[in-house]
Amino acid sequence: SIGAIAIAESNPDIVYVGTGEEDIRGNVTHGDGVWKSTDAGKTWTYVGLGDSRQIGRIRVHPKNPDVVYVAALGHTWGPNSERGVFKSENGGKSWRRVLYQSDSAGAVDLAMDANDPSTLYAAFWHAYRQPWKLVSGGSGSGLFKSTDGGETWKNITRNPGLPAGVIGKIGITVSPVNSKKVWALIEADSGGVFRSDDGGATWTKTNSERNLRQRAWYYTRIYADT
């Protein structure tokens, strides 16, 4: 199965695909890492991260197609180490893990600021499946921000306005026209849609509709139009 597709803006012949769906329902299908095409999908080359199993998002630098970020969720049914945010600076020839929480929590979403690609937001999800249920939420879930291309990260999970208590799955997006505006769809007892007008420093809940978050393992995506 396919969890993420990213086309390089600077060269649309270059496409990265992350395998394994991040919507880990009962019949989830895992993948075998990241694949790359340099001829618009005619042929493909395997470029690694085979034990990441579920890949939720891939982001490519808008001006340099060799700079790639991968949100790897990891194994569905148990702990493993190949999870978190990975970065390549050579088109997938090698990968470096730049953000990690634990062997039970992985990166499920990534947002890149269209006006400043060195600014990134990463969502982590602490989750695992059992044959009869999904355990969603835990100490590894959270929201993180980097302003230096993923080299360092700040935990913004408990910034003013975001929900307290156990956090589950998170979707994150940045306005393409105003870098200060960020939205997050958060699974939590007091979750919902949250908006920041100051780059994630403070937040306001804009929608508490339970239908948006009650079955987070099926879908937790949010996209900014403006």
Where are these regions (language model features)?
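Beta-propeller blade termini and top-face loops
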Residues: 1-226
